[in-house]
């Protein structure tokens, strides 16, 4: 590096239900990771390749640097290329997951993410967004281990763009669902009966109860001249793949309508 390295570091520890083996299946296998974080390709071994599919045309590539079943997995990613800064003077993004079994049938999971850079604005923006993004992901993992442990999800992804602030867009989506965002509140998200599990200014999380089960994460974020709204689903139950094939575009249309005439573009994958 041409400048003294600046350390970027994030660490969090949380408890989830399940044995060490069950938690390992959730955080260190492709089917498990894809069921609460994002669609993932993973070769389950040290040196194996890993790819996180983050939406249309967006993927993060890396490789596994440690693989200790039921205890520890570590992988590195090229975060500079991911955000359009190829060749930047930074080290790989290293993420480590550690599992510690507790009495009573639960485990503590410790996540440590780190890298070195130069302190450039784009680095700080990336880390700020990434650390904020862990809270909803960990809620997903907690709920997955509580309600869907051992199952593999079918992914749903829909998006639209609109005018107005991300906070206003999220409020419009909540209004379209008829919810205030109180935990435990029930609603119908199109044809899925759901309960509210988490609500924040730009994000809320629903747990689908019928006719399919699963998780639906609703997001809104600043995309420059517009706001992007998204729903990311992890669906279980009776033939969720058929549901996604038939309903994914309809979810895009719902997002467009929910954000009230402000949509410039809507697309499904």
Give short role names for the model-derived ranges:
Residues 1-9:
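Short acidic N-proximal helix/loop "leader" segments that mark the beginning
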Residues 9, 13, 19-118:
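Ordered, small/hydrophobic-rich secondary-structure cores
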Residues 18, 30-63, 68, 72, ...:
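Short beta-edge strand/loop motif at the mouth of beta-sheet-based domains
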Residues 19, 25, 126-133, 137, ...:
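Short amphipathic alpha-helical segments
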Residues 29, 39, 140-147, 151, ...:
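A structural signal for alpha-helix termini and helix-coil/disorder junctions
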Residues 30, 67, 133, 137-144, ...:
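Conserved short hydrophobic interaction patches
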Residues 82-129, 200-269:
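Beta-strand/loop substructures that line and gate deep hydrophobic ligand-binding cavities in soluble
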Residues 115-173:
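Surface-exposed beta-loop interaction hotspot
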């Amino acid at each position: 590096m041409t400048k003294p390295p600046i350390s970027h570091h994030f660490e969090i520890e949380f408890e989830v239900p399940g044995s060490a083996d069950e938690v390992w299946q959730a955080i260190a296998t492709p089917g498990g990771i894809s069921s609460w974080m994002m669609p993932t390709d993973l070769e389950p071994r040290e040196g194996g390749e890993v790819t996180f599919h983050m939406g249309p045309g967006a993927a993060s590539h890396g490789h596994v640097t440690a693989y200790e079943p039921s205890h520890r997995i570590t992988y590195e990613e090229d975060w500079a290329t991911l955000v359009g800064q190829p060749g930047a003077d930074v080290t790989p993004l290293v993420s480590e997951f550690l599992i510690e079994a507790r009495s009573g049938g639960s485990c503590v999971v410790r996540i440590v993410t780190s890298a070195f850079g130069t302190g450039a604005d784009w680095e700080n923006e990336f880390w700020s967004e990434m650390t904020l993004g862990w809270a909803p992901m960990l809620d997903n993992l907690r709920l997955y281990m509580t309600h869907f442990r051992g199952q593999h999800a079918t992914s749903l992804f829909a998006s639209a763009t609109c005018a107005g602030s991300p906070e206003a867009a999220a409020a419009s989506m909540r209004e379209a669902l008829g919810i205030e965002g109180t935990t435990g509140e029930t609603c119908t998200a199109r044809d899925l009966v759901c309960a509210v599990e988490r609500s924040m200014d730009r994000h809320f999380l629903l747990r689908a109860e019928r006719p399919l089960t699963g998780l639906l994460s609703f997001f809104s974020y600043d995309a420059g001249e517009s706001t992007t709204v998204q729903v990311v689903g992890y669906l279980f139950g009776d033939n969720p793949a058929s549901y996604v094939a038939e309903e994914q575009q309809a979810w895009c249309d719902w997002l467009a309508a929910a954000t009230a005439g402000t949509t410039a573009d809507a697309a499904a994958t």
